[in-house]
Design a protein with these regions (language model features):
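Short, Lys/Arg-enriched N-terminal segment that forms or immediately precedes the first helix
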Residues: 8-23
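Short, cationic-aromatic polyanion-contact patches
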Residues: 19-30, 44, 74-97
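Short helix-capping/hinge SLiMs at alpha-helix to coil transitions
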Residues: 24, 37-40
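Short alpha-helical "packing" element that flanks the helix-turn-helix/winged-helix DNA-binding module
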Residues: 30-37
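Alpha-helix C-caps/helix-loop-beta hinges
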Residues: 40, 69-70
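A short acidic, leucine-rich amphipathic alpha-helix
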Residues: 46-51
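Short amphipathic alpha-helical interaction segments
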Residues: 53-68
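Amphipathic alpha-helical dimerization/coiled-coil segments
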Residues: 92-130
Length: 130
C-alpha cells in the first residue's frame, strides 16, 4: 500500500502535463500551453500555435484562460509569460478549489508539480543558459 502511494505522488517532466490536468483540472491543451511557456519563456500566440500544432485561436484561448486561472500574465494582447511555477501552480490550484467548492489545503502532488517545473522555468529565463 505504501509503495503505491509513493509512486502515485511522483511527478516528472514526462508526467507533469497529465498531473496538471488531474490535479488542477485544466484541459490538456491548457496544460501543454502552460508547460511550453514555462520551458521556453515569453511566447506569442503564433509561436505557441506553431510549437503545439494548433490554431492561433486555440493557442490564444488556452493562454487567455491561463491568465484567468492565475498561471500567466499577459505582456501584450498576443504575448504571454508564465508566473514562477511556485506561485502559478498554487494560484491555479486555489482557483480550481474555489471553482469546484473544494477546501483549499496542502497537496503534495501540486507542490511536486511546481518543484519539477522550477528548473526549466529558471533555465529559460537565465541569460547564462542561452
Amino acid at each position: 500500500m505504501m509503495l503505491q502511494i509513493s509512486i502515485s505522488m511522483s511527478v516528472n517532466m514526462d508526467t507533469v502535463e497529465e498531473n496538471i490536468v488531474s490535479e488542477l483540472r485544466l484541459s490538456p491543451i491548457q496544460a501543454k500551453v502552460y508547460v511550453l511557456v514555462v520551458k521556453k519563456g515569453k511566447m506569442s500566440t503564433q509561436d505557441i500555435a506553431q510549437h503545439l500544432n494548433v490554431s492561433e485561436d486555440e493557442a490564444n484561448q488556452a493562454a487567455t484562460s491561463l491568465i484567468k486561472n492565475g498561471g500567466f500574465i499577459d505582456i501584450t494582447k498576443t504575448e504571454f509569460e508564465s508566473m514562477h511555477p511556485r506561485f502559478a501552480i498554487v494560484n491555479m490550484y486555489r482557483r480550481m478549489c474555489e471553482r469546484e467548492n473544494i477546501p483549499f489545503k496542502k497537496n503534495i502532488l501540486v507542490d511536486n508539480i511546481s518543484i519539477i517545473l522550477e528548473k526549466p522555468y529558471d533555465d529559460a529565463r537565465t541569460k547564462y543558459n542561452r
